[in-house]
Amino acid sequence: MDVDHNNEPTVTTHRDGFDWRSIKLGWYILAALFLYSLIATIALSRSNRALNELKLAGGSAVSSETPSALTTAPRGLWFPIPGARLPQDDMYLPTAPRDYRRGVNQGFDFYGTSSAVPINFGTPVIASADGVVIRADRDYKELDNEQWLSLLDKVAADGATEDDLNRLRGRQIWIRLPDNRVLRYAHLSDIRQGLAEGQEVYRGQVIGFVGNSGTDDGIKGTTRGARLHFEVWNPDNTFFGQNAETLEQVRADSASLFVGP
């Protein structure tokens, strides 16, 4: 019997004769899902590298690499504890009275739940801006109880000298910024491994950990009362907020001091 070849279906083949129409739609979907998961995995890996410093514990080494987000973020200070905001309690702002030493607060106190995030012993502390470390109290030792009580009696009677304030601040890190302002971090429990005077640090880099050094609880050797005291000193040796007339003005000015994260 004759066959009408003009009515045969036309089959499109590759040079090797493979019929690509034989691949079912499900295989295309599986291939697309595989590519998506590969891209998502790479993106997540990059994000984890940027967040790695905030997950360190026990003084582990911190990479000096700066995530690309740091170079594109707006200028200004980052809060020294990620996620923190201005303390809700005015007593934790600069110029708030400190009657126990006949003076005023010279910085911001991040304590308890007043700053939008819990402040716990060992919470990572970051550099609020690029700068150079000019002080790092790695070998800090607490006063004994007798020395502590003597210091409190002295500042209650006569007010606190700069040396007295240094002892009251506990373990500290100071960072000098390119504009010659100095950031002071106080009451730290520990300093990041490898951090030393003269070292450059970058905004967002972990530099230390929240503690209670230089406080009653620190003297007693407990982990209670954890806080971070953070001061911003101007090149003319005045602290941020010093010339404000009211705490309301300090709070308003502080809103433009910090830009995140």
Regions found by a protein language model. Name each.
Residues 24-43:
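Hydrophobic membrane-insertion alpha-helices, especially the h-region
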